[in-house]
Amino acid sequence: MAEQIAPEEAHRQALVGELRLIDLRDQAEVLASGVIEIAEPLADRPLPQLLAESRQAVALMCQRGVRSARLCAEAADSSPVRLLNVAGGFEAWRAAGLPVNEPRSPFSARERERYLRHFALPEVGEAGQLKLRRASVLLVGAGGLGSPAALYLAAAGLGRIVIVDDDRVERSNLQRQVLHAEAGIGQLKVDSASARLRALNPDIEIETRALRLGRDTVDACVADVDLVIDGSDNFPTRYLLNAACLRHARPLLYAAVERFSGQLGLFAPGRSGQPCYRCLFPDAPGPGEVPNCAEAGVLGVLPGIIGTLQTLEALKMLLGLGDSLLGQVLVVDGLQMSFRKIRVSPDPECPECGS
């Protein structure tokens, strides 16, 4: 069993140099809870090495005293110095009124608590969260695909979300458009979305534009964002977005759903050797060839799955993580629970980027 030391006694001994206080908490815990200036972070050092270098007793402290007690018990017999566990860990230290300083961070205490699980990911951390805070995304459509995308972008701390939609909330939307509620029927979707997202995360900027994208409006919407997420439901809008993304060199995340299936793809028009959306669909289908959701129906959860996958790709791209869907389309069959990727080749005859 680990030898215990009270936080007050550990503090007294550390102040006079009788004890070396080692903080086992990770960066996420420190950012969320606070810094103990007289404690050293263990960081990446092996504990046996630290003990071998010590000339005085060592006390280990974690968030609640559990992890540190286990390490003390495991290392006590082989330790060349006296090894103690700070009883109750950081929480007992703080409860005793001992000194705790605010961490040096660009995030407020509330934000550090909110994004704790991001800070715990080495691939994201504070630096990645700053990237998200500084990023801006255009979300076209606050419907079935746009609902999960908007919610998860806001929850992730995306700094600025621009939502474009000219529709109003209808009761038939609520089977799949989880951004809206019964009380919002008749409201503009952008207003309903803005209220919901501000309630979810008041620290981000939500910009709304109650309009239908056209040739006279699309460039202004695309030019001042980092990434475009297409949650529209028609080919003319997708072609407009693709052309604008080509002009302004913005990545485009496309998605579509029908009945029990969906697909999504990431295009970076303008990049050497990369296809655009129109390489995939050179011409719009004729009238009645591709029914919309109102005609064919859609299982309510499908837009949630596809829209969430869109958001995953968006966050990966903004953070520079993993392998993206760039130049590919992911096809999801909900009934068979199958996922397959199709690589899209640049089309030299493409009416948009072929020249």
What is the role of each PLM region?
Residues 1-3, 18-20, 24-33, 40-57, ...:
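Adenine nucleotide-associated cytosolic modules
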Residues 8-17:
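A short acidic-Thr-Gly-centered motif at the start of a beta-strand
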